[in-house]
Amino acid sequence: MITGIQITRSANSDLHNSFWLLDSETAQARCVCANAGYSEDQVVAVSDLGQIEYREIPLDVKPQVRVEGGQHLNVNVLSRETLEEAVENPDKYPQLTIRVSGYAVRFNSLTPEQQRDVITRTFTDSL
């Protein structure tokens, strides 16, 4: 848990009236601002602050959405034969829509190279 503090008393005069974020899980303190001796965002062990007195400062913490990695899946429900037929006879399939990179696109609007690529990537013999 993160707690905001203002140091009100310390043997180290550089710490007096400085503001810190204390992380109780890692036992570390991050300097928010100090008159001297510490730079903004400097991280030190809480024990390095020595004997201090402080007052807690209310924090307004907004939840963060973290996306770490992830995968994307496009699902096209049709057969290889249908796509190959659409390549040969585009007039018969004017409304054929597929998913490519998260977007819906008309198959006939793709270049021949893109159409071949879609067929190759959609229908594989093994993973």
From Swiss-Prot:
Glycine radical modification, residue list: G102
An example molecular function term from Gene Ontology annotations: formate C-acetyltransferase activity
Keywords assigned by UniProt, alphabetized: Organic radical
Domain Glycine radical: 5-127
InterPro entries named in the record: Auton_GlycylRad_Cofactor, Form_AcTrfase_GR_CS, Gly_radical, Glycyl_radical_cofactor_GrcA
Pfam family, one: Gly_radical
GO CC entries: cytosol
Function, as annotated: Acts as a radical domain for damaged PFL and possibly other radical proteins.
Name of protein: Autonomous glycyl radical cofactor
Native organism: Erwinia tasmaniensis (strain DSM 17950 / CFBP 7177 / CIP 109463 / NCPPB 4357 / Et1/99)
